[in-house]
């Protein structure tokens, strides 16, 4: 019998981290396998093993809408109020041949139910409906909470986990056979949901995310990042749902298939919605066309299929015929070490030699400024160090906040959260405290590295359970109870022991970085050769990747960058994959870029040419005094700072990098000799415009956009606080609302925040807003621009009603619409003046409307 991990007391007080709690209870944590699951029968087992197909059901919301569900009704309450309607729809899917019937619990979390019913009661009623319909397998459906997690929103990871855990326990009690987590856009949120399933049940977990037209989720996660992370944290089947039609999702699913061995599932929409001549929302892809498009995905290796918005029992019947005549196509990921943030993958293939620079600067050892920042809780400075290293060429950031006088568990959690909101790079969590390590990796959105274990049995006993439970990578140091050995063979022996111990937890060599530990040449000159030899042995015999803290070699010697860069080149020749170094060192980075050409990692030398096209040889200093001055420093300037593009505007740098900690003081300083409107129009607005361009180019994603907007908000608030009333011009009035019947307001809130920071006066009417209330506000406030949001197809009717009312009563008003179910064509059909695909587009439309 599975025993859930008890991590909170009855009053909600945290008792222990899950792995610590399990360890005290005598449990041994290892990488989860299929044998750890409670699987109903062999058919379901075959699907989870990837040797058999499985057919989920199709759309429920659009079927309910067709059955007469009123706009604004909570579908989950129909399990009590009209259970026969739910059962009838599900019975149609059973008769169409669906293996899995999804319980009507998509929005059955306490946040969305908001007291309308208990989570337990909804799950019990929903599962009863599915059983009554004759379902072979009933899936407990877990959808998004409907609130942004920190740092973008106010909901903590732990609060999200608790909401999901309540659903999981309710599902287990109601008798579900598996869980399906779907329509997720936030990698941190889906991680919380998967962990809640794993830690509160032993049932199979299917997990899918939703992707935009650009191939990324709302928060910028790619299919590869999603698949790697979901695989790592223990989803048994992973994939894509909703999003678009099956033809558009084929390429995204194919990308997932290249990075995971887990079964991949797809539940596509029947195309994108439109409004027909009678005012009804319809989907155009019919069953034969749908099945034909899905057939291509099945040929690629997708083995679990179903449908989402607009699909019907007819669509599923066509899929039943398709999969009954097909055996799953095998797929295998190419062996590699993959490290991810929520937006970026750093991939080190096992059959090649690729370099990943791990930035070392977020480590308080010997850095007084960072030490003081950590004591003061100044995480803005920590973030600035991460951003600088990203701009200087780091691929991964090491994060170490270890000072004896601070609460390391609290600070490392906050630091990783803030770094993930401001940089795109994956993180390496560096701590000797297992509690601090778990606090960071548990809440980390992606697949990180833990730094580190070593050959001491106690350390391996503490750290490997974390690596196994959270699916991370790990650094293994070649030291043990006897210290650091002198010889290559002794170092290799420790590495071999680390790899063997890791295997006991199901951790393969493709998740291990061995660090053979660099000793300074000033006191251990002969050790350099032994270090390189040890690394070569590890690479050849263990199949691991290797890391080295290369800066240590030159400690205590003059011209440190010179010696360090030569050692770095030698280490690359011996097989070094991940140098832990200062990316701000010119000589180190020169060596990295040069080696990438010689190893053919930089194909066509394009990166090298881009970096060095205008290079001045520092050794020609006798003939060129300017070169001598340039050669006197070994610092790589961060991109976007003075010296690279000539723009030394501190406001611009702080807004673009999302650094809000210092912007208030800088704004106050500039106000001493700048007019307030000059500061806004010539400093803040251009910076926000630049962020918008970076967002459009795919160089920034929503977390970075939000961090920049928050930094700008702090600056604007400072200006408003210090300036007399009326001195700051109002750029225009805008009203935003989520339409009647729709309780989702994440997108609308993001738009409001950005428009606020562009200087507009924004009236936020909230969610589930009646058309008459919107009209009343527009008339009373003399508003020229209205933004309407809808996430569900069932509420687009209310959006159209609101648009028609506004245009009839206030002819001059302009209306922007946005939301996951909308397209430019759909927006035009329902009468909107503008369609905004994202918040940045809303800001540009506002500038057009108000003539700014």
Task: Please annotate each region the language model reported.
Residues 1-513, 519-852:
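Domain-level signal for soluble alpha/beta catalytic cores
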